[in-house]
């Protein structure tokens, strides 16, 4: 259960005191004294709280109060007792007749504390700052100092290890993302690579695409096989053959027996055939006989031609 309020706060006046209110309070206390602060506001004709009347009388209206600046003797007393009592302002003010605890506290915080700091004195311990630093260095013996240094170094190492570990993790994540691209980009990457390969083939002067020039002739039939025009009248190779030779072509070799049989058969038919071995780079017996046929009008899909679905191994068999 709390204390009963000293007054009705609805009709209480707040704020700065006026000179008329000070006169009413001072005259009433001079006649009746300070017996009951709850009844003084009502009996003195003041719309003030009892606590407000008490503080006003104690801090401002008492006849024994001193007003004005503090003297040097008063300052010396405040500093002396503050070094012993600390911030116990009421006890310090009791050593200064006519000064209130509120006046002493305000004067210390606004004046004396700054004055002592400017003189190189700690306002809390009332000792010179240089003396405090000497005490700190002498109080901590060398083992304690080294222990503190080791602790600080350990904290620094832990922090650096954390930063390095974090950076390594970030780099691993970047590398992982580079080696594992988004699956949605696989088709785009494949298309780009295919485009590069295609453009590289087209950029060459004697590109592989020239092999399929139907004007030079490429036919494979039941009776004859021709691959463009291997040699021209001036003895130079045709563009198709040059392209195959320039790009390495198909590594071929013609068995001598098969060539002899083919030549003998064509001679019987009255055809003149010139045999030439094309692309003699090393291989393991895989090859194809490339013959020159002077019929430039023949193409892949002649009406006399027959198309076969040949296996990969059939290309190395002898042609008869």
Curated annotation (Swiss-Prot):
SMART domains: SANT. Keywords: Developmental protein, DNA-binding, Nucleus, Repeat, Transcription, Transcription regulation. Residues 257-283 are annotated as: Disordered. Disruption phenotype: Male sterility due to distorted pollen grains lacking reticulate exine on their surface. Expressed in the tapetum and middle layer of developing anthers. Expressed in trichomes. Its main location: nucleus. GO terms for cellular component: nucleus. It is found in: Nucleus. Residues 37-61, 89-112 bind DNA. The keyword Nucleus applies. GO terms for molecular function: chromatin binding; DNA-binding transcription factor activity; sequence-specific DNA binding. Residues 263-272 have a biased composition (Basic and acidic residues). Residues 9-65, 66-116 form the HTH myb-type domain. It holds the Pfam family Myb_DNA-binding. InterPro entries: Homeodomain-like_sf, Myb_dom, Myb_TF_plants, SANT/Myb. One of its GO terms (biological process) is anther wall tapetum development. Plants silencing MYB80 have the majority of pollen grains distorted in shape with reduced or no cytoplasmic content, display early tapetal degeneration with large opaque bodies in the tapetal cytoplasm, and trichomes on cauline and rosette leaves contain increased nuclear DNA content and produces additional branches. Transcription factor that binds to the DNA sequence 5'-CCAACC-3'. Regulates directly PME5, UND and GLOX1. Essential for tapetum development in anthers and microsporogenesis. Regulates the timing of tapetal programmed cell death (PCD) which is critical for pollen development. May act through the activation of UND, encoding an A1 aspartic protease. Required for anther development by regulating tapetum development, callose dissolution and exine formation. Acts upstream of A6 and FAR2/MS2, two genes required for pollen exine formation. PANTHER family: F14D16.11-RELATED, TRANSCRIPTION FACTOR MYB80. This is Transcription factor MYB80. It comes from Arabidopsis thaliana. The gene is MYB80.
């Amino acid at each position: 259960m709390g204390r009963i309020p000293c007054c009705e706060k609805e009709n209480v006046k707040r704020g700065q005191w006026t000179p008329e209110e000070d006169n009413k309070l001072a005259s009433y206390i001079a006649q009746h004294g300070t017996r009951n602060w709850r009844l003084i506001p009502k009996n003195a004709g003041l719309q003030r709280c009892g606590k407000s009347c008490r503080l006003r009388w104690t801090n401002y209206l008492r006849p024994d109060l001193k007003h004005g600046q503090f003297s040097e003797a008063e300052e010396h007393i405040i500093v002396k007792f503050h070094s012993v009592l600390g911030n116990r302002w009421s006890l310090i003010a009791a050593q200064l007749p006519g000064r209130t605890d509120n006046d002493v506290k305000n004067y210390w915080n606004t004046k004396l504390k700054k004055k002592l700091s400017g003189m190189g004195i700690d306002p809390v311990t009332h000792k010179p700052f240089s003396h405090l630093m000497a005490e700190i260095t002498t109080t901590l013996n060398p083992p304690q100092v080294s222990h503190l240094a080791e602790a600080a170094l350990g904290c620094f190492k832990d922090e650096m290890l954390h930063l390095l570990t974090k950076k390594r993790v970030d780099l691993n994540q970047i590398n992982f993302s580079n080696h594992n691209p988004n699956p949605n980009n696989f088709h785009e990457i494949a298309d780009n690579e295919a485009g590069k390969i295609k453009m590289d083939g087209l950029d060459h002067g004697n590109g592989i695409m020239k092999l399929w020039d139907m004007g030079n002739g490429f036919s494979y039939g039941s009776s004859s096989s021709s691959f463009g025009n291997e040699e021209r009248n001036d003895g130079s190779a045709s563009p198709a053959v040059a392209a195959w030779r320039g790009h390495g072509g198909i590594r071929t070799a013609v068995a001598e027996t098969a060539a002899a049989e083919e030549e003998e058969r064509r001679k019987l038919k009255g055809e003149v055939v010139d045999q030439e071995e094309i692309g003699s780079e090393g291989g393991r017996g895989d090859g194809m006989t490339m013959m020159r046929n002077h019929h430039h009008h023949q193409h892949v899909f002649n009406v006399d031609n027959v198309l076969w679905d040949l296996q990969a191994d059939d290309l190395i068999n002898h042609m008869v």
